[in-house]
């Protein structure tokens, strides 16, 4: 289960919203997996509710020093080249870190990777990232 848009972003920062979502998912089916932003309140709420949680990272977004997504209102919020997207994804997968917009290395767990489908570079990013992951002998698996 993945909340979308503003709800996803609010749950990442607000433990009350994250808890409400986690409890609702648990009530429907405790075996469901909750997806949410890595390093967020969503993960804490899922753990407290006893749900499986997948830490989602973004190939097409930059990160703050706090490990959160750079707000879209910032000029440097989006990644716009295949090379940047590939480098970021490989760093998150292989090293468990991401480099913030200020150059700091932030710990991050990558269980699933998001590429915004409405992004200008979505198809290209997906194709190139998939190719590099496979060429790097990184196994893509379903955890379900």
Task: Please tell me what each predicted stretch does.
Residues 1, 115:
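Conserved, mostly hydrophobic/aromatic
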Residues 2-10:
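N-terminal glycine-rich phosphate/adenylate-binding segment common to multiple enzyme folds
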Residues 14-20:
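Charged helix-capping and loop-helix junction motifs
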Residues 32, 124-144:
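C-terminal domain-boundary segment and adjacent tail
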Residues 39-97:
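Active-site rim beta-loop-alpha module in soluble metabolic enzymes
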Residues 96-107, 137-144:
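Flexible, glycine/charged-enriched surface loops at secondary-structure junctions
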């Amino acid at each position: 289960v993945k909340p979308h848009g503003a709800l996803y972003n609010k749950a990442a920062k607000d433990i009350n919203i994250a808890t409400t979502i986690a409890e609702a998912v648990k009530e429907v089916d405790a075996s469901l997996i909750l997806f949410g932003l890595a390093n967020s309140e969503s993960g804490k709420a899922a753990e407290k509710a006893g749900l499986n949680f997948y830490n989602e990272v973004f190939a097409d977004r930059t990160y703050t020093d706090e490990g959160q997504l750079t707000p879209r209102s910032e000029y440097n919020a989006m990644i716009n080249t295949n090379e940047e997207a590939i480098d970021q994804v490989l760093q998150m997968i292989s090293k468990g870190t991401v480099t913030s917009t200020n150059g700091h290395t932030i710990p991050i767990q990558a269980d699933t990777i998001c590429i915004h489908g409405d992004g200008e570079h979505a198809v290209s990013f997906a194709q190139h990232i998939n190719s590099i992951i496979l060429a790097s002998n990184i196994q893509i698996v379903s955890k379900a």
